Amino acid sequence: MKLLKRLVSVFAIVLAVGSNAFAGDEVRIVIDEGVDGARPIAVVPFVGSAPEDISKIVADDLRNSGKFNPIAVSQMPQRPTSAAEVNPEAWSNIGIDAIVIGQVVPSGNGYSITYQLIDTVGASGTPGAVLMQNSYTVTNKWLRYGAHTVSDEVFEKLTAIRGAFRTRIAYVVQKNGGSQPYEVRVADYDGYNQFIVNRSAQPIMSPAWSPDGQRLAYVSFENKKSQLVVQDLNSGARKVVASFQGHNGAPAFSPDGSRLAFASSRDGVLNIYVMGANGGTPTQLTSGAGNNTEPAWSPDGNSILFTSDRSGSPQVYRMDASGGSATAVGGRGSAQISADGKTLVMINGNNNVVKQDLTTGVSEVLSTSFLGESPSLSPNGIMIIYSSTQGLGKVLQLVSADGRFKASLPGSDGQVKFPAWSPYLTK
C-alpha cells in the first residue's frame, strides 16, 4: 500500500498560503460540448462510500482530456468489483476495450483507494488481463487528490502521455463588491479546493507560475502603480521585483526559474525586458516602433514569443532570448508553446483560441467563444484553459487540445480571468 504523503508535498505548499483564506464560491466545470468521437471507456462505480465519489472524479478527468468518452453507468453490462468478476466479452460487445474498477474503504483517519485497469479485448494478450493496479491511503482532505492520482496513472497507461490531473490553476477574481474585490486564487485544475493567495483593493493581473510550482509572479496595482510581485507559496512572503516608471506587466518565468521576462514602458514605449527572478537590472530585448508585450518562453529557454503591434495591428513574434531581430509567427496575441515544442497556442484575429503545428504551420480553431483571452496549456499539452466573456462578465473555459471537449468554469462571486496552468506538481 502506498501512502500519498510523498506526492502531495507541493500541493500542501500551495494550500499553506490559503489555509486561512478559503474562497467559498468555487469555479466548477460545466460541460458545454461532449466527446462523442473520443475513445469509449468505462469507470465502474467503486465499491464502498466516501465523502467524494472517486469513480465520478476519475471519469470526469478522463472526459476532460478529450481523449476518452466514459459511458454512463446505465449503459454498463455489469458492475464487477474485481478482475475475476469481469466478463470481457460483455464489454467488448459494446465497444469498450478497457474498464476501471475499484473500491474505497475507511482506513485509520482516512480511506484506502484501490483500483484495477482491465483489458477487455486482449490487446495485452489475454482478455480480462489486469493492465495495472494500485492502492493508496489518503486522509479525507486528500480524497480528490487520490482520485486524480488514479486518473493520471490510467491516462498514462492508455495513452503513453503523462497525466496532468494533479495540477492546479491560478487566476484572478474580481468580486462583486467588498473593500478588497481583487483576488489571486489557486485551485485544482477542475476548480475544486480553491484558496486565496492574495487580495487587494486595487487590480491584480497576469499570474504566472514558477517552473517548480512554488512561486507566483503577478501584476499588482496596490500602490497606485503597476508593480511585478513574486510570492512564495510556502511562506506567503511577497517581494516587489519591478516597480519602474510607467507600466510593468505580463511576467513570465524562464524554464529554469532563474529569470523573468516582462513588459515595461519605463522608457516611454512598451518593450520586452528580462531580469533575474528576484529582481535586478533588466535587459531590454525589443526596440523600435510599436508596443511589445505578453512574453512567453520556449521550452528550452532559447527564444521568446511576444505580442507586438509594430506592423500596425497586434500579432505574435519570436526572437532569441538574448535579443536581436524578431520573426512574425501570426495570430493576434497571448502565445504559448507546448512543453514538447511542437505546438503553439494563441488568440487569433477573431479572438478565438487556435493551435498551430510548428512543423507544418497548419492552424486549427479550438474555441468560438466570445472574446477569448489568456490561453494557458496544461503541462502535457492535452488541455487548455482560457478566459472569455459571457454576458457582462468574464469566465474561464476549458477545451481539450483536439477540440473534442469544451466546458465552462463560471465563478459565482465575480468575474474570473487571467488563468495560468501550473507545471507538474509531483515527481
Curated annotation (Swiss-Prot):
Residues 1-23 form the signal peptide. SUPFAM superfamilies: TolB, N-terminal domain (SSF52964), Tricorn protease N-terminal domain (SSF69304). One of its GO terms (cellular component) is periplasmic space. InterPro entries: 6-blade_b-propeller_TolB-like, PD40, Tol-Pal_TolB, TolB_N. Gene3D superfamilies: TolB, C-terminal domain, TolB, N-terminal domain. The keyword Repeat does not apply. One of its GO terms (biological process) is cell division. Belongs to the TolB family. The Tol-Pal system is composed of five core proteins: the inner membrane proteins TolA, TolQ and TolR, the periplasmic protein TolB and the outer membrane protein Pal. They form a network linking the inner and outer membranes and the peptidoglycan layer. This is Tol-Pal system protein TolB. It comes from Haemophilus influenzae (strain 86-028NP).
